[in-house]
């Protein structure tokens, strides 16, 4: 959806109520900028001269310089992207910006925004990975943490980036924590260093059902 600002309605996503707001980022441009910003803060910042500290923070001015040259956007555009990001991927604070999760570069990941952790979480994977996961557990692979979602629908949506028919897994988050494994909340995503096989259950998924996730 578009992002913009209105003197009457304030910042908005999609359209403002009065219909007189100014669109600052069209939907297509928003996708391009947020995708590049995500990569910059998670994977390839060094290639553009952006330095991340041990907690993943970068100086906002350095990021804005690159985004301005590449896409012609400024601070307000970035603020809107951060505010309305559907998964809460980014954080702005004291003139710095970071991605909360998803890094392939080395940053400290043992922090959490706190709050209640659901007893059950969900992760979707390609069918060809299933046997290995059930034997050895869920590993971060190319990322530094395993990512989990609070709903089956969200997990399937993420899983479809890698497979047209992902397998849905239910994670016993309560069991993980009782076993001393820390589960962290970062934005709308939950992360963990590793999920042992005993905390994983394979689910079927029917989005048309009022109870779409069923174990088997």
UniProtKB/Swiss-Prot annotation:
Belongs to the KptA/TPT1 family. InterPro entries: Ptrans_KptA/Tpt1, RNA_2'-PTrans_C, RNA_2'-PTrans_KptA, RNA_2'-PTrans_N. Keywords: NAD, Transferase. Pfam families: PTS_2-RNA. It comes from the Archaea. One of its GO terms (biological process) is tRNA splicing, via endonucleolytic cleavage and ligation. It is an enzyme of class 2 (transferase). One of its GO terms (molecular function) is NAD+ poly-ADP-ribosyltransferase activity. Its EC number is 2.7.1.-. Removes the 2'-phosphate from RNA via an intermediate in which the phosphate is ADP-ribosylated by NAD followed by a presumed transesterification to release the RNA and generate ADP-ribose 1''-2''-cyclic phosphate (APPR>P). May function as an ADP-ribosylase. This is Probable RNA 2'-phosphotransferase 2. It comes from Archaeoglobus fulgidus (strain ATCC 49558 / DSM 4304 / JCM 9628 / NBRC 100126 / VC-16). PANTHER family: PUTATIVE PHOSPHOTRANSFERASE, TRNA 2'-PHOSPHOTRANSFERASE 1. HAMAP family: KptA.
